[in-house]
């Protein structure tokens, strides 16, 4: 069964066509700079042959048209016609309390996704655009929504409740939701497979470390806590996001810098994190170069990032009353061996010892703790698209033709 996976951003559209019988990727790519000058479609087929098409993409409609044309192209395409696509799986960032699992898309589902747009104003409207365009172009093809927030809906109330008036939750649904759920689900499951553990009788901490970063505690296959909150701004120090801070800072800075709330939130989302601390970059490769060159703020940014990760790992060990494995994933987690090393060396209290040689491995599955370590530490490259394809297949398989 061929599943087209769509991940629609505000100015980009990532896609993969996956044969779910073999779980092989038949084609993948990205439409970049949608609505901006310099639009481009980058495409790769199953043989790994790459192609690029520069053409104006004023909107997502044009982008999806170009994707469908590329997939059915006689020279470089993956399928002979659009009829070969059995279903479409859409990544949707925020499902609020409406969705605890992936669902078949219908008008009610679309209405609920719209209701959650205030909680994810940068993401949900873009996700909806992708759904709308696919509905126009392939009206008879079933579509499934897979939510970033769904995996975290198993958190108990004491984990997701904020210390604010309860009426805020009742009236406005102010609570912790968490994000990157599809990644946390895949990596936690894959970690137990990789280590030969029982997923439903295990305690796993997943560190999804990228430009956006989050940590989750997964006990017996259920998420019991996660670092991101109502929005993806809470938790770890990230590439450009501040993570946890004292809310009173907003009023304090508002008065002293003469900024309104929206301006401050823009700074906290786009100009903070390791970029804000270092003044150099949000990219950890640039930070490493600057640190090695003697830049003290770049060094501080890396230390602060690693320290926050360590704190959360320690807290989640307490939340689960122990841990079997800690796994790193996403761009930084999979490739930044120096950051991993900084974190793992502070987990000695768990009986963890870093295997320096194994830690040199980047971008592939590995155990980076020594054989004597009581808790295993792994690198597990994430595969959110595969989870979306699997969920889509499972739901569509239940439909009657």
From Swiss-Prot:
Signal sequence annotation:
none
Give the Gene Ontology MF terms in alphabetical order: acetate kinase activity; ATP binding; magnesium ion binding
SUPFAM superfamilies, per the entry: Actin-like ATPase domain
The catalytic residues are 148
Q: Please indicate which superkingdom the organism of origin belongs to.
A: Bacteria
Quote the InterPro entries the UniProt record gives.
Answer: Ac/propionate_kinase (IPR004372), Aliphatic_acid_kin_short-chain (IPR000890), Aliphatic_acid_kinase_CS (IPR023865), ATPase_NBD (IPR043129)
Keywords tagged on the record: ATP-binding, Cytoplasm, Kinase, Magnesium, Metal-binding, Nucleotide-binding, Transferase
In this UniProt entry, which residues are annotated as the site Transition state stabilizer?
180, 241
Extract one GO cellular component term from the record: cytoplasm
Could you describe the subunit structure of this protein?
Homodimer.
> What protein am I looking at?
Acetate kinase
Give the species: Helicobacter hepaticus (strain ATCC 51449 / 3B1)
Gene symbol of the encoding locus? ackA
């Amino acid at each position: 069964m061929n599943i087209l996976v769509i991940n629609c951003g505000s100015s980009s559209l990532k896609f993969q066509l996956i044969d779910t019988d073999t779980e092989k990727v038949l084609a993948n790519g990205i439409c970049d700079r949608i609505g901006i000058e310099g639009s481009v479609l980058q495409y790769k087929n199953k043989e790994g042959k790459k192609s690029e098409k520069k053409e104006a993409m004023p909107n997502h409609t044009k982008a999806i048209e170009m994707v469908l044309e590329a997939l059915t192209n006689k020279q470089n395409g993956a399928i002979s016609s659009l009829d070969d696509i059995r279903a479409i799986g859409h990544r949707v960032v925020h499902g609020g309390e409406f969705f605890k699992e992936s669902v078949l898309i219908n008008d009610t589902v679309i209405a609920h996704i719209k209701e959650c747009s205030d909680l994810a104003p940068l993401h949900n409207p873009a996700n909806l655009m992708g759904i709308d365009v696919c509905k126009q172009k392939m009206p008879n093809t079933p579509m499934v929504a897979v939510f970033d927030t769904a995996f975290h809906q198993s958190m108990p109330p004491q984990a997701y409740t904020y210390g604010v008036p309860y009426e805020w939750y009742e009236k406005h649904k102010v609570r912790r939701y968490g994000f990157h759920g599809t990644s946390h689900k895949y990596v936690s499951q894959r970690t137990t497979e990789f280590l030969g553990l029982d997923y439903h009788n295990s305690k796993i901490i997943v560190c999804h470390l990228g430009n956006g970063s989050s940590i989750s505690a997964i006990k017996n296959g259920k998420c019991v806590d996660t670092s991101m909150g109502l929005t993806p701004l809470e938790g770890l120090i990230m590439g450009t996001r501040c993570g946890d801070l004292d809310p009173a800072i907003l009023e304090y800075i508002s008065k002293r810098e003469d900024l309104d709330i929206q301006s401050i939130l823009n700074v906290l989302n786009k100009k903070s994190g390791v970029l804000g601390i270092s003044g150099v970059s949000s990219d950890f490769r640039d930070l490493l170069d600057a640190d090695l060159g003697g830049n003290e703020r770049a060094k501080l940014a890396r230390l602060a990032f690693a320290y926050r990760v360590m704190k959360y790992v320690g807290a989640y060990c307490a939340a689960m009353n122990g841990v079997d494995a800690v796994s790193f994933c996403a761009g930084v987690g999979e490739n930044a061996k120096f950051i991993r090393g900084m974190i793992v060396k502070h987990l000695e209290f768990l009986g963890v010892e870093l295997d320096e040689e194994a830690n040199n491995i980047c971008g592939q599955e590995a155990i980076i703790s020594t054989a004597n370590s009581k808790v295993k530490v792994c690198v597990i490259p994430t595969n959110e698209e595969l989870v979306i394809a699997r969920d889509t297949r499972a739901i569509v398989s239940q439909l009657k033709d």
